[in-house]
Amino acid sequence: MHRFTLYTHPYSRGTNVVWMLKECGAQYDVKLIPFGEAMKSADYLAVNPMGKVPALKADDTVLTETAAIITFLAEQFPDKHLIPAADSLARGEFYRWLCFSIHLEYAGFDKINRVPDSSERRKAIGYGDFDTAFATLRNHLAKHDFIVGDRFSALDVYYTGLLNHFIRVMPMRGIPPVFVTDEPVFSAYIDRHTARPAFAETMAWAQQAAAELEKQA
């Protein structure tokens, strides 16, 4: 098995990678990278030239991008059944929903940043508009407990993190929510998967890591 080192911050998407590592039962080390100068330092830029977290070092190979890291880990621990079989149609569905998430992210942040919407802009952009993207996901989750198949997968780590961030975390930090009404389908999905023991362990880690960074500040 590879030796894993995760570079992350508790208030970043790296928390989803911690959750995934715990679901996998992986052995790993964590290096906390404070926001600001440390993340743009020469030492860290040698790890990730983008100067962002998370980054996962597997032996001497560095992986970045949360979706890529989570998918890689699912493949590394086949006994955990966190990704459909490679020769299955469900694996194709997995890739479809993995790539679909970009519509949600772009459209969601457009909403947060109050980017003006119009029919002309919807025709011009290369990703789905907010209403269509989230309606597509909402309709899917109204019929399914999981993003793909009939069991929890790496995609549920990714999507739970994404939806939780938009619906619950951002408002807690004073950022206007992307939805102006209750979202029972999304809330039920978030509640279902944040009830997992590995998520609770991840939140405990995040609290401890945040306290550690505060002491270092």
Set out the residue ranges of the language-model regions:
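GST-like domain detector, emphasizing the conserved glutathione-binding G-site
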Residues: 1-124, 131, 138
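Short, solvent-exposed turn/loop segments enriched in Gly/Ser/Thr/Pro and often Arg
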Residues: 34, 154, 206
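A late-sequence structural motif
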Residues: 196-197, 201-202
